[in-house]
Amino acid sequence: MSDKAAAPRKQGRNNGAVVMMCLSFVFGMGAMSYAAVPLYRIFCQVTGYNGTTQRVEQMSSVVLDRKMRVTFDANVAPGLQWNFKPVEREVNPKIGETIQVNFVAENKSNETQRGQAVFNVTPGEAGAYFNKVQCFCFTETDLKPGEKLEMPVVFYIDPEIVKAVESKDIHTVTLSYTFYPKEGPKPVASNEGGTVKIEKKL
């Protein structure tokens, strides 16, 4: 076979390799974009970055004499007709002390509504040391028309906060919640007996 005949074939193979590399790059970028949000969320939960609090299963074994002022903020996003507020606007626990506070939500609409609370701590440097043992934000909340619900939050401030350079001078932190609407079960059809079938969202 002459060099002239082999050249087009070689060029064709090279072009095919380039196409495959481009396709692999496109699919790879798509996969990275899809995974970016959950990976970022995990990163924030592990590091406390961007004011994300920590979820723990056990209480602190160390309690310091120093206290931390903790204030609370409650918000409701459009689409959810709820009143939502903290029972207490602020508390002053000792650092390392486990404490329970309560929030109250009331459905002012004439239909059952489902909400999911999203939380944040400011200043952001305190997020890694704000440990939640129990919180209504771990699950979705359903409220019937006119229903009023008191919801607890159990937390403590990690004593390590006084050792870190970026957080040792923090004396006040704010825990903020925003409730967002979530879709619940929807009536989709009626059977012959007149009862409503419920479709559960997966």
UniProtKB/Swiss-Prot annotation:
Keywords: Cell inner membrane, Cell membrane, Copper, Membrane, Signal-anchor, Transmembrane, Transmembrane helix. It is a single-pass type II membrane protein. One of its GO terms (biological process) is respiratory chain complex IV assembly. GO terms for molecular function: copper ion binding. Residues 38-202 are periplasmic. It is found in: Cell inner membrane. GO terms for cellular component: plasma membrane. Residues 1-14 are cytoplasmic. The chain crosses the membrane at residues 15-37. The keyword Cell membrane applies. InterPro entries: CtaG/Cox11_dom_sf, Cyt_c_oxidase_assmbl_CtaG. Belongs to the COX11/CtaG family. Exerts its effect at some terminal stage of cytochrome c oxidase synthesis, probably by being involved in the insertion of the copper B into subunit I. This is Cytochrome c oxidase assembly protein CtaG.
